[in-house]
């Protein structure tokens, strides 16, 4: 809850309107009151909703935190041009048909998404290939290296580095003029202070091994691995998560401000 409140304050301090997105008792909310923010942060019956789940969640009157795909869809419907998240979903390791719905949403939703890359527990190379196939531009903010969420360097380089929010706003405007803006535009913003790479690699290897032992498959893999990192990193995973979302919220607000001036 404190992190969510801090993030909204960071957005306001950087000249943009903060609008946290969630579903509460079947109703989509763009912007939350303090008590609603508390409910989403602390309630035990909050489900995770992708874009495919939104109609079901609404009909069943459930409360839900939204994935990147659902957040992008709702934000676009609400007329928002920019949103911040932690890490993107993508292609799972060794399972070519196991892909996050985030990728499809990015392929058909005209919005700017700021993230710290894709989670390093995924197949980063395959995810970047899919984004290229879907004509989704990926810009590195002050870097030409694609970040891997916990790490600044996923091992993959980017074609485009941008060094200012004004540049990003200009590209946003050019996409509108050229009518190439029917997809999302991803801005990759590396974690301010990455996890120790040796610790990361050890946890990833152990976590993947535990997945196989416990026969964890499908959409259960990502939360399982994230929880494994959280439980076995002595707070490092949580620290980085918090730093990432605050850093991305700040950059998103600055980009939104720059776009509004064009």
Indicate residue ranges for each PLM-predicted region.
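A C-terminal functional module that forms or caps the active site or interfaces directly
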Residues: 183-244
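Short, solvent-exposed amphipathic alpha-helical segments in soluble enzyme
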Residues: 1-6, 126-133, 149-150, 154-157, ...
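Glycine-rich nucleotide/cofactor/substrate-binding loop typically near the N-terminus or early
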Residues: 1-59, 178-193, 200, 210-212
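Solvent-exposed alpha-helices and their adjacent loops that cap or buttress functional pockets
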Residues: 12-13, 74-77, 82-84, 98, ...
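Anionic-ligand binding region
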Residues: 149-177
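General beta-strand structural signal in soluble alpha/beta enzymes
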Residues: 18-23, 64, 82-87, 113-115, ...
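Short, ordered loop/turn segments at secondary-structure junctions
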Residues: 23-26, 87-90, 116-119, 141-146, ...
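Active-site glycine-rich loop that binds ribose-phosphate moieties when present
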Residues: 67-68, 94-107, 111-132, 165-170
């Amino acid at each position: 809850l404190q992190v969510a409140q801090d993030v909204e304050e960071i957005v306001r301090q950087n000249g943009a309107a903060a609008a946290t997105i969630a579903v509460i008792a079947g109703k989509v909310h763009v912007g939350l009151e303090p008590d609603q923010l508390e409910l989403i942060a602390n309630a035990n019956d909050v489900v995770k909703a992708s874009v495919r789940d939104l109609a079901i969640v609404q009909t069943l009157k459930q409360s839900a935190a939204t994935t990147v795909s659902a957040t992008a869809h709702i934000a676009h419907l609400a007329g928002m041009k920019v949103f911040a998240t932690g890490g993107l979903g993508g292609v799972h390791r060794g399972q070519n048909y196991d892909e996050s719905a985030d990728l499809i949403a990015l392929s058909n939703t005209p919005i700017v998404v700021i993230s710290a890359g894709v989670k390093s527990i995924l197949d980063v190379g395959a995810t970047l290939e899919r984004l290229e196939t879907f004509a989704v531009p990926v810009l590195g903010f002050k870097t030409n290296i694609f970040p891997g969420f916990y790490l600044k360097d996923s091992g993959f380089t980017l074609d485009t580095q941008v060094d200012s929010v004004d540049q990003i706003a200009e590209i946003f405007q050019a996409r509108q003029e050229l009518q190439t803006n029917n997809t999302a535009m991803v801005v990759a913003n590396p974690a301010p202070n990455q996890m120790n790479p040796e610790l990361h690699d050890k946890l990833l290897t152990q976590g993947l091994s535990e997945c196989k032992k416990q026969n964890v498959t499908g959409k259960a893999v990502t939360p399982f691995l994230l929880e494994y990192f959280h439980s076995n990193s002595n707070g490092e995973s949580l620290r980085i998560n918090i730093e990432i979302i605050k850093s991305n919220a700040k950059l998103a607000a600055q980009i939104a401000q720059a776009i509004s001036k064009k």
